[in-house]
C-alpha cells in the first residue's frame, strides 16, 4: 500500500487529483492516512477505525477540486452529490462523505 503523500509523480492519479492536498484534507477532517486505491478505477482508500474493511473513493478518470480548482465545478458536484440517497450523511466513512470532504 502506498500512502497518498508518497505516490510517485509517474502515477496516473496525478492527472486527476493532488494526493498531497488530499492527504492534508484527510488528516484535517479524519485524522487518518489515505492510500492509493488497489482498485484500478478508484483514487484512494481508507480504513475506518475499528474496521477490517477498506472504503475506496474518488472515480478515475474524473478530476476533483484538488486538481482543477474550479469553484463552479465544485459547486455543481457538491449539489449533485448531496442528493445521493442512503445513510451517507450518518456514516462519516461512506465513499460519498469521503469524496465530499477530501476531494471537493
Name what the model sees in each region.
Residues 1-104:
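Arg/Lys-rich, low-complexity, intrinsically disordered basic segments
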Amino acid at each position: 500500500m502506498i500512502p497518498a503523500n508518497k505516490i510517485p509523480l509517474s502515477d496516473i492519479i496525478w492527472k486527476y487529483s493532488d494526493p498531497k492536498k488530499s492527504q492534508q484534507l484527510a488528516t484535517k477532517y479524519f485524522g487518518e492516512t489515505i492510500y492509493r486505491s488497489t482498485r484500478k478505477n478508484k483514487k484512494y482508500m481508507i480504513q475506518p477505525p475499528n474496521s477490517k474493511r477498506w472504503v475506496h473513493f474518488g472515480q478515475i478518470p474524473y478530476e476533483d477540486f484538488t486538481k482543477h480548482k474550479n469553484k463552479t465545478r465544485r459547486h455543481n458536484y457538491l449539489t449533485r452529490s448531496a442528493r445521493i440517497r442512503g445513510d451517507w450523511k450518518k456514516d462519516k466513512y461512506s465513499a460519498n462523505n469521503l469524496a465530499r470532504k477530501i476531494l471537493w
